[in-house]
Amino acid sequence: MKVQIVFFSITVFIFVLFLLSVESNTKIKIVPSFLENSNEIEDLYINLDSDSKSSEHTTSSSSSSNSKNKGDSSSSSSNSGSSSNSIISGDSNSKDAPTTSSDSLSPATPIPTDGLLSASTYVTFTGGKVLCENITFCPNGYMYSSDYACNYDIVQNDPATHRGDWNDGIKMFEDPLPKNTTIDQVEGISFTISGAVGCQVTSSATTLEFYIQDLLVLTNTTSRYDICTCGSCYVTFGTEVYKYNMLGYNITGENKFQIQVSVNSMCATTIGITLYYKPPTITPTPTITPTPTITPTPTITPTVTPTATPSTTPSTTPTTTPSTPTPTPTKSPYSGALSPQVKKYIIIASSITGGLLISIFSFVFIRKRLNSKRSGYTQIKDGKDIDTQQIKIGVRIGKGNFGEVYLGTWRGSQVAVKKLPAHNINENILKEFHREINLMKNLRHPNVIQFLGSCLISPDICICTEYMPRGSLYSILHNEKIKISWSLVKRMMIDAAKGIIYLHGSTPVILHRDLKSHNLLVDENWKVKVADFGLSTIEQQGATMTACGTPCWTSPEVLRSQRYTEKADVYSFGIILWECATRQDPYFGIPPFQVIFAVGREGMRPPTPKYGPPKYIQLLKDCLNENPSQRPTMEQCLEILESIETKGFDDIPVNNNNNNNSNNNENNNENNNNSDNNNNDINYSNRVIN
């Protein structure tokens, strides 16, 4: 009987484990296990190719220089007005300067970049500043740079007057590819030149040869003429993307770059090198559902073994009468009724098993309740899978690169439904989509957009969030029918600061990385909520939401692909403060690729607003400081905003973006000196994100 009790207890215990495994497995099915180890933050890689193509043009200008770099090749030429590209795929045997005959060049065909990622780096040319120190502005369509270098001398064959550190066009650069990227993943390459090309107007064309590790990568022939009398005035153009086989390339360190100019001359400020590579292939790990093994309780058949056999043979003696004795059977150890001892064992085992079951189920229930609570906020259900048949889709209220946004009704409430287009679905997008859903469903704050649920069944992949009737802050600022007072701006910026502080205070720290007025949504009571912090990396794939695009709100350290902290979000918050004070687009009319260079390398900032509360204007300038450690924290921004006095200031009018960048150069000097003049005693601590 003891064996029965043991088998019964083991069976009950295995059944309990089965119940727990089913509960655990149900959770795993919501998010596949191969997505749980995804990287939290990806590096920002800037693809200048699409922007640089739009800036290609041909201009005419006179030049007094007729010489070229003595290290450049002069063996290739082209007819006036023509443009061609060639690439070389073989090895070079040259040990010093690269040399390649134009007869060996084969026509190159641009490759498509669909589905490819990109990583960029820059080489800079300096040393020509003294020649153009009196220049303050450039003609329309040209940018100004304080430093540059040229491939020819001011006075022919006079090395003493050489323009800058041209050095035969040779520069070294660090590999920009992400860690663990292999050579086999690299598909193509493109180059972006910021400078003046075609200085000798008497020549018909300019031939540019690009070398990496002394191997010719690309030959570009163009018939463009730019202003070359002063290298400080320049334009930016780029090549298309061509196949690159990475011969001789050092993927773990420094590489040698060289540009050779023939037939004509050029000046350069920077040259961008962009590599295009395939994303890594991720093999999903299948989810294994444990199958419990239940051992059936064996049926024990009782065996009755008599201890003695009664004698049936009569025993007789001559002197006695024979008699048949009555047999006395021995009592069987098994009987129909359980003995008191067996009943005692059964009661004890049942009590222990029942107590264990009650304890386990109580623990699971309490753990669920504790994990779901968020102190200080109204508890709602965690974001979960939604049956799209329960959603009534209404009118379209927005459209972006992520997909279309519709006003919908779900369980009697208005919701915003973002649908992922079927043609946009791939493994990387789904992986990022799952990761960001897991992030958003755990956030609860009055100034953070509420995530309600999602559908992950293709093709109806979508997410549902709360609906904000007044739309984005950007649309409000640019609506001439809406009057905006300084008190309303103060209130909305306080709301935004509280939402960002909540994200920065999370564990681990959540950096928005895409803060802008488009991602601050407003409800019917003018309360502002931070949105799109979860899907920013998806929506930024090749996206520009305005004529200027996301770079206008991005901090200089991010544009330079450097390490960044939560102070990068503080810089973006400063641009939003500027938008509210002016009701204009930052850097209106300047192409995004020029904004990237001007903000990241030249220190350009929007012009300081001339009207508004002094504390507000000073906070705006402090947030845009070049040095991240000199920027205030979001907690300090909130404290300053709450102390601002807005009485006596008129409503902020809508501006038409005219001349809002005319004072950029003057304003840049002021911004660059902020840390020296105003904030020498401030050194905010940073939490560095690798």
UniProtKB/Swiss-Prot annotation:
Entry EC number(s): 2.7.11.1
Gene Ontology molecular functions: ATP binding; protein kinase activity; protein serine kinase activity; protein serine/threonine kinase activity
Entries under InterPro entries matching the protein: Kinase-like_dom_sf, Prot_kinase_dom, Protein_kinase_ATP_BS, Ser-Thr/Tyr_kinase_cat_dom, Ser/Thr_kinase_AS, Ser/Thr_Kinases-Pseudokinases
Glycosylation sites: N134, N180, N220, N250
Binding positions (ATP): I397, G398, K399, G400, N401, F402, G403, E404, V405, K418
Bilayer disposition of the protein: Single-pass type I membrane protein
Reactions mediated catalytically: L-seryl-[protein] + ATP = O-phospho-L-seryl-[protein] + ADP + H(+); L-threonyl-[protein] + ATP = O-phospho-L-threonyl-[protein] + ADP + H(+)
Chain ranges of the Protein kinase domain: 391-644
SUPFAM superfamilies, A to Z: Protein kinase-like (PK-like)
Enzyme class: transferase
Cellular component aspect of the GO annotation: cytoplasm; membrane
Primary location recorded for the protein, binned into one broad class: membrane
Gene Ontology terms: biological process: signal transduction
Bilayer-crossing regions: 346-366
Signal sequence coordinates: 1-24
Family the UniProt entry places it in: Belongs to the protein kinase superfamily. TKL Ser/Thr protein kinase family.
UniProt-recorded name of the protein: Probable serine/threonine-protein kinase drkB
Gene name tied to this protein: drkB
